């Protein structure tokens, strides 16, 4: 068998091995994310019982700032927690009044940055992300 054919067969085998490994890892990540979503949703629903919406925001921000920078799964869990908690907590009538709509890029970013600084997390992208999630929630309630 010629050398070029051996090299080609080895490269094809390596390609398929990498393909199988990628599919397997993607499947495992999807299963983990599904389990995390259910667990986080259950935690948020339990947390929301007897509480008002601001408590949900405080807890979600606290969870987010504990995430390692760059840990997208942790931030997604914090966002899921906030959305689920806000859906089950009692919302005060004026809760969203001071939250700007999620349509003006500069306005929403400035508000989130100012609010994070007020909460003791200046220049923290994780806090900003949580408050932008709050803006989405409030925009959908208007």
Locate each region found by the language model:
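N-terminal positive-inside, membrane-proximal cytosolic segments immediately preceding the first
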Residues: 1-9, 33-35
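Non-cytosolic head/periplasmic domains of membrane-anchored proteins
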Residues: 54-58, 62-142
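Generic N-terminal initiation segments characterized by hydrophobic and/or small/turn-forming residues
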Residues: 2, 28-30, 83, 131
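Immediate post-signal-peptide N-terminus of mature secreted/exported proteins
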Residues: 23-72
